[in-house]
């Protein structure tokens, strides 16, 4: 989502309605002419908004209304003449110079331009409903109508002005959910509210390069930069005045047109309607804006302004102090002074002072323009009139002098120095003249509105601390001047008051301060006290007109004007407060003042011992109300207003608030032998007492300021005291502020949590249709409505396959289940495959099906078997990093390479005949397996490798998967590739070709692949194997764990010996080596696995142990052969055994010298060899599972009977047969003869029954059954997983669940911890462990009991269940 560019200053907006407002100054406005309206419309169309990228774009009104963020571009409206402006500077200049109704008595009408943050608030005059503009303006336009150019987007109303529309949209609070906490304005979007809040919070990132001013928006900075610009290229054709923009010039021309219309109406009124037409001469009259004198030429008007109103002329602003030349801008003036008057000293033209720079001279000239009163401006409002001295106060300014009395020395001469308009006196009881305001930091006092003053404070004095403005009437503190003005207008103004005689009553509902002894009224408390002390006080301090009988005696202190009821209390007050010793009688005489002498007003509390200094009477009054509420003051009717606001003496150089300190050296006047003190009006009879009294005054003046907190008194100035006192109230803390909502947090974690909870949106993306939703419920509804389509599936109950169409299911039943009924001779005795559970009608069909489960391609490294050669080659590349497919084929590919059947060019006709021949050969082998001819036929045919190579295979032309039967290939193509058996036409071949072509292409050989993983595996073949395994002995890296194991064997120091290093027993073969390693159980480690008894290296699996045995035995045979060739007379028998390897039958364990004497059969994917005798017993109906070993045949009482299915050993033949009938009823007798024998454990053990729960072993089945029954009685049938608290009904299911725990997050693959075979199901891995690996292969040992486990999760569950405290 792109963010809209910041609003830029635009030209003035045209006025679309007639001006119907009559202002208070007596100017009557009329409807503008059509020419003026058309001119403004053309100017509006030609106005362009310049963006940040420097490009210009014309924007019409309709486009601006349709913008999404229209609420963020405020319109500035003049409340006097109802003109709309889009630029803050244009409105300010209009109100200052051009607005004809700017002389009204409402200073709050220019509220909109007070600051960038206040332009979004409703106008005070609009909220209160008063003002000169509302008298003539009807409310119909603001309420809206129909057919107007600015329609509301929430209702059917439309408005004639954009400002009315924006004001109306604020009432739709339900449509505008985001509210500004500062000005309560509503917004439709959160980003608009956040951008607006920055105007309040002061996020000022746009700084001025000319001064230290900073702004939050770029358009405000551009407005400010115009104050530094000296160019005014746009000139007025009437008065030749220059302007910086066309909008300012246009607004100025409107003033000229209104002057003409006003003169025309005035002239027509004088003629009493005698002539209806206005002459051409009257239309050309030009009127002065200040005295209403008319002129026929513009030159005469300019000459009149320069001569009669020089203080108001624009040309009188910048005049050289050395010569009468006038300049239009400050830069030209300074350049003129540097060039022409560079050698002259900078001297003040009004006094004899000299200054080092021109800037200092101009700052000094401002001091000559200050009036005698501390109130710099003639404001009509008692609260707002003295902004500099009464309203602006910081929270810690109670101990500082008034800012208004100390002008800022850093003021630049370029700031406006326009002189004040002459204000009329108040003697006639009426108020007239222009309202002006003064700055509390500098000497500027010609601000005609609070808005202009606010802009001045925020631009020129932005580095000053934040001000708090206090109301003089109720002492309430307000943040801005605008808020103070509104507070006075609402809280202290009575609508029904008549203020014709007293102008102060126009702005306050509180009556002026009344004198208790005469009907006079005064605007402030200082004037009232001075009036009482001068007019109503006699020589003895008694107020004139009061009598002692009535008890109205009032005695006032000449020093601080405090009132007392008795003369004794007044005398005591003077002795304690104003002097250390009384030398004479106190008399209340007003001293003679010299108005021409400058003075400084200071106030101090008379009730505090160490009184702080107050710069204004307001601060002293607030201090007395807060700290001295119970002290009685002068008894008069205005006790609260007069007595509480009485000023007190100060211990600085000026004591009285209305006295002037005499600067010249003067001696006390001696009259009638008395020495009067000119500081406190005390008289002394002796000169010594008078000198002692003066000494006390000097001590008070020289006494240093003390800190009220720590009583430190070494402060030379008030600023030093204030800086020191600030330290006591200042503390620093680190807070983390949210940029969006300005909330503060003490730590980064709390802020991040707040951002995640409040300012982070979680979106939900539908991957099916790419739609985005903002809540989980929404996307659930979307999935339920759009993507939850019912679809009927057809499932085969025999093999649990699902089909989308009924025809596909029928085809599957036809090929897989039709035509295989059970034998009639043996009802219910259908042959069932022990591997997949599928049933067959005849034994031949079952045997043919069993061949599909055989895996003819075995890995010579790890013993894993595969159906197809391509799978074996992939296994060699991935697991063993062998890239030659022929090297890894241990059975069918070692001599003859790839089988002939694994080709894509297999024909169905030949495949059918080959399958029939295969069935005939298999049946003949089963019937004549015990004869010698069978063995001879095997020898004649060239061995089992040739038989394997001649077997036909049906390969998939898409993925390369090979099957022994065509039906299996068809099922594979239907299940995995969705290709039906009948699709053999050209269309299906095209579809097949498109399907075969993958989307992932190799950049090296241009081969395509279906998935990215396949391409990644193929790319590894070009780069070579990745070496991730490092040898801990030499640091060399290897691509697989197998190659690393083979490398580690080469570091063995026992390379030429085949003896055990522990018991020194010689080892002759690999089988003896493995058997002997198991005879030393103390060498086994639960963490790392086994140890080789020859080289003592630690191995982690039986596979690695086999590699060690092969390596050591090969070294032993090679060393023995070399020794025999060296001249040994007789060869050792060990060498003969090694030269002639023996092969054993899997059932009877007889040894055979030739491998061809054994018949190969695969059971569970593993190859086994059976002799001819075992095969003949299987065909004659004898149980092949009953096996008597030749070694134990001659021993009495010892038998070797094992079950071929579960490899459990039995003592008698009856026990084995009963076990098969009970536990393995579905096992085929023809396939049960293959016995599973591992090379690692050729010696049978005594205990053959083991409990899965506690791993105890038993000799007989009855013992383990009793043991399992005890488990069920004691512990129940439920078995709980301690890792996740899930319940299972058997220990085997619990073990399968623990295997899943071990491989969580591994991508759905399960790897055997012993031989590293990978499975996709946990139960398959469990079956593999039970079938291949035994008790000796377990890795993890329990530290508290002798139990061992394959997986760590088994050990953890065992520890929590059996050994938990």
Curated annotation (Swiss-Prot):
Bias-annotated ranges (Low complexity): 112-126, 386-400
Keywords assigned by UniProt, alphabetized: Activator, Developmental protein, Differentiation, DNA-binding, Metal-binding, Neurogenesis, Nucleus, Repeat, Repressor, Transcription, Transcription regulation, Zinc, Zinc-finger
Gene Ontology terms: biological process: cell differentiation; nervous system development; regulation of transcription by RNA polymerase II
GO cellular component: chromosome; nucleus
Bias type Polar residues, positions: 902-913
Start-end of C2H2-type zinc fingers: 76-98, 150-172, 178-200, 206-228, 234-256, 286-309, 318-341, 346-368, 437-461, 469-492, 513-536, 555-578, 603-628, 675-697, 705-728, 736-759, 764-787, 794-817, 831-853, 857-880, 954-976, 1000-1022, 1029-1051, 1090-1112, 1201-1224, 1249-1271, 1279-1301, 1310-1333, 1340-1363
Feature: compositional bias, Basic and acidic residues: 37-51, 261-274
Keyword Repressor: yes
Residue spans of biased composition, Gly residues class: 885-895
UniProt keyword annotation of Lipoprotein present: no
Domain of life, source organism: Eukaryota
Residue ranges of the region described as Disordered: 1-69, 99-126, 250-280, 366-429, 885-916
Any Pfam family the entry gives: zf-C2H2
InterPro entries found in the cross-reference section: Znf_C2H2_sf, Znf_C2H2_type
Main location: nucleus
Subcellular location: Nucleus
Biased composition (Basic residues): 1-11
UniProt cross-references to Gene3D superfamilies, sorted A to Z: Classic Zinc Finger
Family: Belongs to the krueppel C2H2-type zinc-finger protein family.
Protein task: Transcription factor that can both act as an activator or a repressor depending on the context. Plays a central role in BMP signaling and olfactory neurogenesis. Associates with SMADs in response to bmp2 leading to activate transcription of BMP target genes. Acts as a transcriptional repressor involved in terminal olfactory receptor neurons differentiation. Involved in olfactory neurogenesis by participating in a developmental switch that regulates the transition from differentiation to maturation in olfactory receptor neurons.
Record's protein name: Zinc finger protein 423
Organism: Danio rerio (Zebrafish)
Gene expressing this chain: znf423
């Amino acid at each position: 989502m792109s963010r809209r560019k910041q609003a830029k200053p635009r030209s003035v907006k045209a006025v679309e309605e007639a001006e119907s407002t009559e202002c208070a100054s007596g100017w009557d406005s009329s409807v503008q002419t059509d020419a003026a309206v058309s001119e403004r419309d053309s100017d509006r169309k030609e106005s362009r908004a310049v963006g940040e990228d420097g490009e210009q774009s014309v924007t019409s009104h309709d486009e601006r209304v349709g913008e999404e963020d229209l609420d963020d571009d405020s319109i500035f409206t003049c409340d006097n003449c109802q003109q709309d402006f889009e630029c803050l500077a244009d409105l300010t200049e209009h109100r200052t110079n051009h607005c004809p109704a700017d002389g009204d008595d409402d200073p709050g009408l220019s509220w909109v331009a007070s600051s960038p943050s206040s332009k979004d608030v409703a106008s005070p005059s609009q909220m209160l409903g008063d003002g000169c503009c509302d008298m003539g303006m009807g409310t119909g336009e603001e309420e809206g109508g129909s057919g107007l150019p600015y329609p509301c987007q929430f209702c059917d109303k439309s408005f004639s002005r954009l400002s009315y529309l924006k004001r109306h949209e604020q009432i739709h609070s339900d449509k505008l959910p985001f509210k500004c906490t500062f000005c309560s304005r509503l917004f439709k979007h959160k980003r608009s509210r956040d951008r607006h809040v920055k105007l309040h919070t002061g996020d000022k990132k746009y700084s001025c390069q000319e001064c230290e001013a900073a702004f939050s928006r770029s358009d405000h900075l551009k407005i400010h930069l115009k104050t530094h610009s000296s160019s005014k290229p746009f000139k007025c054709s009437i008065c030749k005045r220059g302007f910086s923009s066309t909008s300012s010039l246009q607004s100025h021309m409107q003033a000229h047109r209104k002057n003409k219309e006003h003169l025309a109406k005035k002239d027509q009124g004088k003629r009493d309607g005698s002539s209806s037409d206005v002459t051409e001469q009257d239309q050309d009259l030009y009127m002065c804006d200040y005295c209403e004198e008319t002129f026929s030429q513009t030159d005469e008007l300019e000459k009149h302004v320069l001569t009669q109103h020089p203080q108001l002329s624009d040309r009188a602003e910048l005049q050289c102090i050395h010569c009468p030349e006038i300049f239009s801008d400050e830069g030209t003036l300074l350049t003129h002074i540097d060039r022409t008057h560079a050698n002259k000293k900078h001297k003040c033209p009004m006094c004899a002072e000299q200054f080092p720079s021109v800037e200092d001279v101009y700052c000094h000239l401002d001091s000559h323009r200050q009036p005698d009163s501390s109130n710099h401006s003639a404001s009509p409002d008692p609260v707002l009139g003295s902004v500099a001295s009464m309203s602006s106060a910081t929270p810690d300014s109670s101990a500082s002098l008034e800012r208004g009395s100390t002008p800022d020395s850093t003021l630049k001469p370029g700031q406006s120095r326009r002189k004040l308009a002459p204000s009329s006196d108040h003697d006639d009881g009426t108020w007239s003249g222009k309202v002006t305001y003064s700055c509390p930091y500098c000497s500027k006092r010609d601000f005609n509105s609070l808005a202009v003053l606010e802009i001045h404070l925020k631009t020129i004095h932005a580095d000053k601390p934040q001000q708090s403005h206090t109301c003089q009437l109720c002492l309430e503190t307000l943040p801005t001047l605008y808020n103070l003005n509104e507070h006075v207008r609402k809280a202290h103004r009575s609508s029904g008051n008549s203020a014709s005689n007293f102008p102060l009553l126009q702005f306050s509902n509180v009556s002026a301060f009344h004198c208790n002894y005469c009907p006079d009224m005064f605007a402030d408390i200082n004037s009232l006290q001075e009036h009482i002390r001068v007019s109503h006080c006699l020589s003895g301090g008694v107020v004139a007109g009061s009598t002692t009988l009535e008890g109205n005696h009032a005695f006032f202190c000449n020093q601080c004007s405090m009132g007392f009821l008795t003369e004794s209390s007044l005398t005591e007050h003077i002795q304690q407060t104003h002097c250390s010793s009384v030398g004479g009688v106190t008399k209340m005489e007003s001293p003679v003042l010299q108005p021409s002498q400058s003075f400084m007003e200071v106030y101090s509390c008379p009730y505090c011992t160490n009184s702080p200094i107050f710069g204004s009477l307001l601060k002293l009054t607030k201090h007395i109300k807060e700290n001295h509420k119970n002290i009685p003051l002068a008894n008069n009717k205005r006790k609260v207003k007069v007595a509480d606001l009485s000023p007190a003496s100060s211990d600085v150089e000026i004591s009285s608030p209305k006295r002037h300190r005499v600067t010249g050296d003067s001696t006390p006047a001696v009259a009638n032998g008395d020495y009067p003190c000119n500081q406190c009006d005390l008289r002394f009879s002796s000169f010594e007492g008078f000198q002692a009294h003066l000494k006390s005054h000097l001590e008070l003046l020289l006494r240093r300021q003390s800190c009220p907190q720590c009583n430190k008194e070494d402060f030379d100035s008030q600023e030093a005291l204030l800086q020191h006192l600030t330290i006591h109230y200042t503390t620093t803390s680190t807070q983390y502020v949210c940029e969006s909502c300005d909330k503060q947090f003490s730590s980064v974690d709390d802020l991040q949590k707040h951002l995640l909870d409040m300012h982070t949106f979680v979106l939900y993306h539908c991957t099916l249709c790419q739609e985005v939703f903002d809540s989980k419920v929404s996307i659930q509804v979307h999935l339920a409505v759009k993507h939850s389509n019912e679809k009927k599936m057809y499932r085969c109950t025999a093999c649990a396959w699902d089909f989308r169409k009924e025809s596909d299911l029928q085809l599957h039943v036809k090929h897989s289940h039709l035509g295989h009924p059970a034998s009639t001779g043996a009802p219910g005795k259908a042959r069932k495959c022990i591997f997949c559970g599928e049933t067959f009608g005849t034994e031949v069909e079952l045997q043919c099906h069993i061949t599909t489960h055989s895996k003819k391609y075995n890995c010579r490294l790890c013993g894993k078997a595969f159906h197809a050669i391509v799978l074996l080659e992939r296994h060699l590349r991935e697991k063993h990093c062998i890239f030659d497919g022929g090297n890894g084929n241990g059975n069918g590919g070692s001599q003859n390479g790839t089988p002939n059947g694994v080709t894509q060019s297999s024909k169905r006709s030949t495949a059918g005949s080959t399958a029939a021949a295969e069935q005939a050969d298999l049946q003949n082998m089963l019937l004549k397996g015990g004869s010698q001819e069978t063995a001879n036929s095997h020898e004649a045919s060239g061995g089992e490798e040739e038989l394997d190579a001649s077997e036909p295979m049906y390969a998939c032309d898409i993925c390369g998967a090979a099957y022994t039967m065509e039906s299996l290939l068809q099922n594979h193509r239907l299940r995995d590739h969705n290709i039906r058996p009948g699709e053999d036409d050209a269309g299906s071949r095209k579809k097949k070709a498109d399907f075969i072509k993958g989307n992932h292409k190799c950049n090296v050989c241009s081969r395509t692949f279906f998935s990215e993983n396949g391409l990644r595996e193929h790319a590894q073949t070009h780069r070579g194997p990745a070496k991730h395994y490092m040898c801990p002995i030499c640091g060399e890296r290897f691509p697989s764990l197998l190659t690393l194991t083979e490398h580690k064997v080469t570091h063995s120091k026992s390379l030429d010996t085949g003896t055990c290093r522990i018991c020194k027993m010689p080892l002759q073969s690999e089988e003896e080596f493995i058997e002997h390693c198991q005879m030393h159980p103390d060498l086994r480690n639960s963490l790392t696995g086994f140890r080789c008894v020859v080289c003592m290296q630690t191995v982690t699996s039986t596979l690695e142990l086999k590699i060690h045995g092969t390596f050591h035995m090969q070294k032993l045979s090679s060393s023995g052969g070399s020794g025999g060739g060296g001249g040994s007379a007789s060869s050792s028998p060990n060498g003969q055994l090694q030269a002639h390897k023996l092969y054993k039958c899997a059932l009877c364990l007889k040894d055979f010298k030739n491998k061809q004497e054994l018949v190969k059969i695969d059971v569970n994917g593993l190859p086994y060899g059976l002799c001819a005798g075992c095969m003949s017993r299987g065909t004659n109906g004898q149980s092949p599972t009953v096996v008597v070993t030749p070694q134990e045949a001659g021993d009495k009482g010892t038998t070797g009977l094992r079950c071929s299915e579960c490899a459990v050993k039995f003592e008698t033949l009856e026990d084995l047969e009963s076990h098969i009938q009970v536990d393995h009823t579905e096992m085929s007798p023809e396939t049960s003869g293959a016995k599973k024998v591992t090379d690692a454990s050729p010696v049978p053990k005594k205990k053959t029954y083991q409990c899965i729960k506690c791993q105890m072993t038993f000799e007989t089945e009855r013992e383990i059954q009793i043991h399992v029954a005890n488990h069920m009685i004691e512990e129940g049938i439920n078995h709980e997983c301690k890792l996740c608290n899930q319940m299972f009904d058997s220990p085997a299911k619990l073990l399968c669940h623990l295997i899943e725990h071990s491989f969580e997050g591994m991508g759905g693959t399960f790897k055997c911890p012993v031989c590293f075979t990978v499975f996709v199901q946990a139960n398959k891995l469990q079956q593999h462990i039970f079938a291949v690996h035994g008790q000796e292969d377990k890795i993890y040992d329990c530290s508290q009991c002798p139990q061992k486990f394959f997986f760590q999760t088994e050990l953890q569950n065992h520890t929590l269940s059996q050994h938990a405290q």
